[in-house]
């Protein structure tokens, strides 16, 4: 029973080598970086499991004996957005390594804005020595949108750093020591308290374009940072790039950090590139590590074949 690594834009080699280390008895197949399988088409009949990142729909259609589709990304919209889905379970990979990487990114960006990173970079360029007032972490409220595994862990990390953390999610969630809000009724209350808004939302019909001019205008305006800050490490489709660019340019947002965008790679002509109060990273907040995640997948496959239930199954209707 073969495993196929079907990825577009990534080199499959590191995944293949790690899977072969962990499961030498299994046949491991791979696509090219273009997502196309160039091997013997007859070999696809052996494929029972696919590890996917932006898989080609025509390739999935050729897998007559597929049993499980594993997403190699933190999100699953790259699969759920396909015009036709195979009628098999889709599983997300939830792993401590991936979770830790996301929390590191969130903490890095929160601290950059909290400790006035842009101002210090400017002062250094000007060769000017000036002590800036530094608010305590406890004076700053971090609002986290999306309270799944990644959001919960990021919230706990920020609490340990001393920040006041609140959360918002589609449905009601309870997290010890963190005030949470949910649904449309809770959104405005949540936004009105947030000095730094961190989005770790999945991309669903309900979240598409949610971070727009209207939402940004409802963020807290009189906080210790001089205005609100936006951090998005969730999905690019949840934001309106043009609205964020305009808000950064006119001061509605005093700063932002974006790891995701509506169009990726971010086009050279995007106005976001020229903004000096924006940190841009190329969708690397939580890059999947073959060494860590392949073990998780092999363990899941082994358990599944022994009759156990798969973990972290995706509900296509909900989008995550």
Predicted feature residues:
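C-terminal helix-to-coil terminal segments
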Residues: 92-105, 119, 264-320
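Phosphate/diphosphate ligand-binding glycine-rich loop within oxidoreductases
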Residues: 46-121, 135
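NAD(P)-binding Rossmann-fold cofactor-contacting core
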Residues: 160-177
